[in-house]
Amino acid sequence: MALWVVTLSSLVMTSVFAGLQEFREAPTYREVNPGGTVVLPCRVVNKLGECRWEKDGTPVGMYRDKYEWDGDQASGDCSLRVKEANIEYDNGVWQCQVTASDFTQQDTLISEGAELVVRGEP
């Protein structure tokens, strides 16, 4: 019983002092011209999990010269840089996600969907 109380106290103290991860800035509506570059912001306080992105409900991988991290993930910047914007591939609803800080925590983050509009050719 004493071990359980000490363990529970440690978990509570860790959560209070370290804080749970939470969005500082979530992605919002953006527009970009075809062939342009746009940054979808996503900044997280107390980030311990892994940054991920989805477009229209499908996971998006990082690809050099197309989808790249814009900031330092270790410091909580999960922002995504979309290069060479293309209406076929990039137009849609994007979500920033951060996995739980560990398997015992329920602090997974999933942003509201943010629409990225690739403008049509004039």
Kindly label every feature range from the protein language model:
Residues 3-6, 32-41, 48, 73-77, ...:
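Solvent-exposed loop/turn motifs of extracellular immunoglobulin-like beta-sandwich domains
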Residues 21, 45-68:
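N-terminal V-set
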